[in-house]
Amino acid sequence: MPKIKTRKAAAKRFRLTGSGKFMRRRAGHNHLLEHKTSNRKRKLAGVALVSKQDLANVRLMLPNTH
């Protein structure tokens, strides 16, 4: 039986926390920032947790994380 491979695109975008949750970046903080408020940019700069609805898909893409 072949080895299970990790989806590298997902591996670059998600990090596993110590409690078993996945962290992700927020969308909308790369460009076109001049019209966004400082408050909005500050909130977009932080990391977010993957929602429980998406968690199963992330785990399928990253099979070697525990």
UniProtKB/Swiss-Prot annotation:
Ribosomal protein among keywords: yes
> Know the name of this protein?
Large ribosomal subunit protein bL35
- Family membership, please give it: Belongs to the bacterial ribosomal protein bL35 family.
Q: Which domain of life is it from?
A: Bacteria
Gene Ontology biological process = translation
Matching entries from InterPro entries are given as: Ribosomal_bL35, Ribosomal_bL35-like, Ribosomal_bL35_CS, Ribosomal_bL35_sf
Q: From which source organism is this entry?
A: Synechococcus sp. (strain JA-3-3Ab) (Cyanobacteria bacterium Yellowstone A-Prime)
Tell me which Pfam families the record gives.
Ribosomal_L35p (PF01632)
Instruction: Tell me which UniProt keywords the record has, alphabetically.
Output: Ribonucleoprotein, Ribosomal protein
Single GO MF descriptor:
structural constituent of ribosome
Q: Which residues are the signal sequence here?
A: none
Among its keywords, does the record have Ribosomal protein? yes
Q: Which cellular components does GO assign to this protein?
A: cytosolic large ribosomal subunit
